[in-house]
């Protein structure tokens, strides 16, 4: 599977992790928290630099 992902600085990555952790402390499941933060990042970085990644887990 191919996917374009936002190119994030280390600081942006750290903030995303902290937000996911906070959402989980507030009772959200890890999957929901990750999905929410990922969607927010995609929206915020729409039209900006993207990094193409390949997920090799599909067989």
Swiss-Prot record:
- What protein name does the entry list? UPF0181 protein plu2693
Q: Which domain of life is it from?
A: Bacteria
Q: Which Pfam families match?
A: UPF0181
What's the family?
Belongs to the UPF0181 family.
Q: Which residues cross the membrane?
A: none
């Amino acid at each position: 599977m191919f996917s374009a992902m936002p190119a994030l600085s280390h600081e942006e990555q750290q903030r995303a992790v902290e937000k996911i952790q906070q959402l989980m402390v507030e009772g959200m499941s890890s999957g929901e928290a990750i999905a929410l933060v990922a969607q927010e990042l995609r929206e915020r970085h729409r039209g900006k630099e993207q990094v193409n990644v390949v997920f090799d887990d599909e067989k």
